[in-house]
Amino acid sequence: MMIAAVAVSTGFAAEAVASAERRQEEARADSLFEVAVEIIKKYETMHHPRHWPLVGYGHKVLSGEKFDRKTTLTESRADALLRSDLRKNMRVFRQFGRDSMILGVLAYNIGMGNVMRSSIVKKLREGDRDIRDIYISYNRYRGKTHKQIKRRRIEEFDRLFITDTHIANTANTVKEND
């Protein structure tokens, strides 16, 4: 009887740890998503009618979408559109797991097709996550290196790239809190 109680107790403890780890992972993902939104807003800023077909924080108006080309979106509408676009991008890259966020952010700026054909995706498909230099090299505008875009890439990478150390630290934090 005592052995059964210990086994049940151990099972509950393991389940509680797994549940805590899932909650920690979800909280980390939510917080990284908020960081991604913050970075995009910082560098895209709000687009005005003269920037057509870009609206809000860089959403490209697609055929069939109803936007008034003479009106600037409200902050809340632009924010909702940015979040929706970023989530769509991340879903496209979900096969890359923890790298779906950073790929989605890059696609938000340079386009989905460009990211899909990139050397970054090629390296990740080969299992090579040493992509910092390549990621930052996506800093050109009209063929020339652009300092502001380079700064953006560095900030995106430094704040959004999830390292193995980061994952280990998150797991240790969960264990310490139990």
Language-model features: locations:
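Long, amphipathic alpha-helical surface segments
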Residues: 1-5, 9-46, 59-62, 66-92, ...
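Alpha-helical scaffolds flanking conserved acidic
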Residues: 33-37, 96-105
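N-terminal hydrophobic or amphipathic segments with adjacent small-residue motifs
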Residues: 50-52, 105, 150
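Early exported N-terminus immediately downstream of N-terminal targeting peptides
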Residues: 51-59
